[in-house]
């Protein structure tokens, strides 16, 4: 851990919470987001959060840009199980360490006297036959009391832990602490006065019998002196922890403003909504770079790879959208009788008349046929033939030669004086028809010639205008190519920088997508038929990149936070757990630097974190001083039992010696040379007993192996001293 930074002066008046309007808050946030780093550098302060990049850190952790298998390890990192186990360990350890030796000793003596299991009574009851039997009974008696005492104290301590859990202190969440470390390596906090924020959860908890049963406490307190000391210390610890955690608030990620002064190496933080100012706990110090900072955090290291993989997946999605859109070309094969001018004439006949005879005699039909014939011309000379055919067909309808007066000027002088005959009339009719045909053809040719000349002039003008437009188009195309190239270079630069915020979204790309128009009309003939054509589907593969990103997530989380992977015999992952190094790296700064809680007892180990609550309680009990006190009392009690048995045998042997001396004959007075014991064994035993009795009388005035300093002239087994 890097330690505390030098921070700006902290004003207590600035801690007052102000609630501005929502519109002003949003405008203020937009202002912060649009702040230029260069402008801030002039004031020696730069905004390092929120920025586009730091906001993306949190969105990536939330799975907005996708989710991989390796990213799931982060859930193991931000699990609160380790912090909960540490709090349980602290309450248990410090509460049980409050036991006093004198209280524990008095509780044991009281229990032994109430059950009639003192050392003297055990010696009299079980020691007359065998010392081993009495010692075994004594050991079982003490183990029974020891286990019941352990169960009682652990249950009371667990009730204290339950009370602390129901306090529901979420302002200093361990998960938010891990999120800040993973994103920025900095933890912004706001501290409050403990006196003003002190809230004791124990009285409230004690008033609810379902959570904190008072009857259990009073019952245990009436029988055991150690309960009072344990519960008193436990309440103090719970109050201390709850007040310490309530006095600290870890700020929310989306409502925090962090500024950095590179020259002073200072950080200052502010809550955008409430206006509160706090301090920053620097776990990993950021590095200055080109008007901004580079964070020493896992998200900073893998951010570029995540964005590139996300862009690749977006590109694949766009390719799937583009390449699955079919280009449909529908072509129909026509009948041979429907091709060309003949087919068009047949259609006209069907439209203008039901029968071919009626259609042929129709003036509209003949006129349409003339238009179709003119449209089907391939040469200029075809005009005369087409018009003549039309006139031949309609000569009886357009021109009535009998009604024409040939004597009028224009028909010649010879026709005026001659009488008309049938032959002459026929010849005149032919001449008139030929003259009419020639006049019509000449008029049409003159009209077409004028129209064509006019078209030629128009075409020449259009060619000149087209030439100018073509020059302008070429210049515009060159300019457009230049703009496209610059835009492509700029977009590629932003993509290389890993900033996907400048790239258009998938919806915009799909909307602005231009499809090439494929014209196949020139290669199609009358023999073509209907067909559907689809473009080939190409989608870039990103499985390898996705797998690499998953492995990168996994390696970064495991190595950065020192996690441990548990596998089975087949090598399959079973679980991801905290190692001892991870606990030291993450848990210790959380309690010491963030919460300012220093008296937490020993740090839990990785094996204790994943134990059940019952196993943890038993494990903690064996590490406290009460366990040592109980071992000492057990040793002393066994020694007292053995001593009481030895004394019992000594007293019994002395009484037997006195009875034998009374049975001796007169005159001997117990002299050694005059009296012989029935056996050598009896003689040796009597000598040892006499030596022990002499030694006991010599040291009777000493306070020898006194188990209770307040006893009035009594031995450890309760008998009155000599």
Curated annotation (Swiss-Prot):
Residues 658-683, 697-706 have a biased composition (Basic and acidic residues). The keyword Disulfide bond applies. Residues 684-696 have a biased composition (Basic residues). GO terms for cellular component: host cell nucleus; virion component. Residues 404-422 have a biased composition (Polar residues). GO terms for biological process: chromosome organization. InterPro entries: Herpes_Portal. Residues 402-426, 658-722 are annotated as: Disordered. Residues 713-722 have a biased composition (Acidic residues). It is found in: Virion; Host nucleus. Homododecamerizes. Interacts with terminase subunits TRM1 and TRM3. Forms a portal in the viral capsid through which viral DNA is translocated during DNA packaging. Assembles as a dodecamer at a single fivefold axe of the T=16 icosahedric capsid. Binds to the molecular motor that translocates the viral DNA, termed terminase. Belongs to the herpesviridae portal protein family. This is Portal protein. The gene is MDV018.
């Amino acid at each position: 851990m890097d330690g505390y930074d030098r921070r700006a002066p902290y004003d207590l008046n600035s801690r007052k919470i102000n609630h501005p309007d929502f519109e002003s808050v949003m405008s203020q946030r937009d202002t912060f987001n649009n702040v230029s780093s260069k402008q801030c550098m002039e004031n020696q302060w730069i905004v390092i959060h929120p920025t586009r990049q730091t906001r993306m850190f949190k969105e990536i952790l939330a799975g907005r840009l996708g989710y991989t298998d390796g990213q799931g390890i982060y859930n193991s990192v931000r699990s609160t199980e380790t912090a909960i186990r540490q709090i349980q360990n602290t309450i248990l350890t410090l509460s049980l360490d409050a036991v006093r030796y004198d209280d524990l000793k008095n509780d044991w003596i009281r229990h032994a006297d109430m059950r009639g299991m003192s050392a003297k009574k055990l010696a009299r009851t079980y020691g007359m036959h065998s010392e081993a039997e009495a010692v075994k009974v004594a050991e079982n008696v003490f183990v029974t009391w020891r286990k019941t005492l352990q169960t009682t104290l652990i249950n009371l301590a667990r009730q204290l832990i339950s009370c602390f859990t129901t306090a529901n202190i979420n302002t200093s969440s361990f998960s938010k602490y891990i999120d800040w470390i993973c994103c920025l390596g900095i933890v912004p906090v706001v501290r409050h006065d403990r006196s003003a924020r002190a809230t004791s959860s124990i009285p409230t908890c004690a008033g609810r019998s379902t959570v904190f049963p008072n009857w259990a406490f009073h019952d245990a307190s009436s029988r055991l002196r150690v309960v009072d000391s344990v519960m008193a210390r436990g309440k103090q610890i719970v109050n201390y922890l709850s007040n310490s955690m309530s006095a600290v608030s870890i700020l929310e990620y989306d409502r925090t403003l962090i500024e950095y002064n590179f020259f002073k190496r200072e950080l200052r933080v502010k809550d955008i909504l409430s206006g509160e100012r706090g301090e920053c706990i620097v776990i990993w110090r950021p590095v200055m770079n080109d008007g901004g900072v580079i964070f020493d955090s896992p998200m900073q290291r893998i951010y570029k790879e995540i964005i590139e993989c996300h862009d690749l997946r977006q590109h694949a999605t766009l390719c799937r959208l583009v390449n699955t859109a079919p280009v449909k070309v529908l072509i129909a094969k026509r009948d041979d009788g429907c091709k060309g001018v003949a087919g068009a004439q047949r259609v006209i006949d069907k439209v203008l008349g039901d029968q071919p005879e009626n259609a042929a005699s129709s003036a509209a039909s003949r006129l349409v046929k003339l238009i179709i014939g003119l449209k089907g011309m391939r040469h200029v000379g075809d005009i005369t033939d087409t018009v003549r055919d039309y006139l031949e067909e309609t000569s009886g309808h357009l021109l009535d030669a009998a009604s024409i007066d040939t004597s009028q000027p224009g028909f010649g002088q010879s026709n005026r004086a001659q009488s008309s005959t049938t032959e002459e009339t026929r010849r005149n009719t032919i001449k008139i028809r030929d003259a009419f045909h020639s006049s019509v053809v000449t008029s049409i040719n003159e009209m077409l010639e004028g129209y064509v000349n006019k078209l030629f002039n128009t075409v020449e003008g259009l060619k000149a205008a087209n030439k100018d437009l073509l020059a302008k188009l070429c210049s515009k195309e060159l300019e457009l190519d230049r703009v496209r190239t610059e835009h492509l270079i700029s977009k590629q630069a932003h993509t290389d920088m890993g900033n996907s915020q400048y790239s258009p979204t998938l919806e915009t790309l799909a909307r602005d997508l231009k499809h090439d128009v494929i014209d196949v009309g020139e290669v199609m003939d009358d023999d073509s038929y209907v067909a559907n054509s689809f473009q080939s589907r190409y989608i870039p593969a990103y499985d390898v990149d996705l797998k690499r990103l998953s492995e990168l997530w996994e390696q970064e989380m495991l190595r950065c936070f020192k996690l441990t992977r548990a596998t089975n015999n087949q090598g399959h992952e079973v679980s991801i757990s905290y190692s001892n190094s991870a606990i030291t790296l993450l848990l210790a700064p959380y309690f010491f630097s963030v919460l300012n809680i220093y008296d937490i007892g020993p740090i839990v180990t990785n094996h204790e974190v994943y134990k059940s609550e019952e196993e943890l309680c038993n494990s903690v009990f064996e590490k406290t001083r009460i366990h040592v006190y109980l071992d000492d009392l057990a040793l002393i009690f066994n020694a007292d039992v053995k001593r009481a048995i030895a004394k019992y045998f000594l007293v019994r042997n002395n009484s037997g010696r006195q009875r034998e001396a009374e049975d001796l004959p007169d005159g001997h007075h117990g002299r050694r040379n005059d009296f012989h014991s029935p056996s050598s064994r009896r003689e040796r035993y009597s000598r040892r007993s006499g030596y022990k009795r002499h030694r006991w009388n010599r040291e009777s005035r000493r306070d020898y192996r006194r188990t209770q300093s307040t006893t009035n002239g009594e031995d450890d087994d309760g008998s009155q001293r000599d």
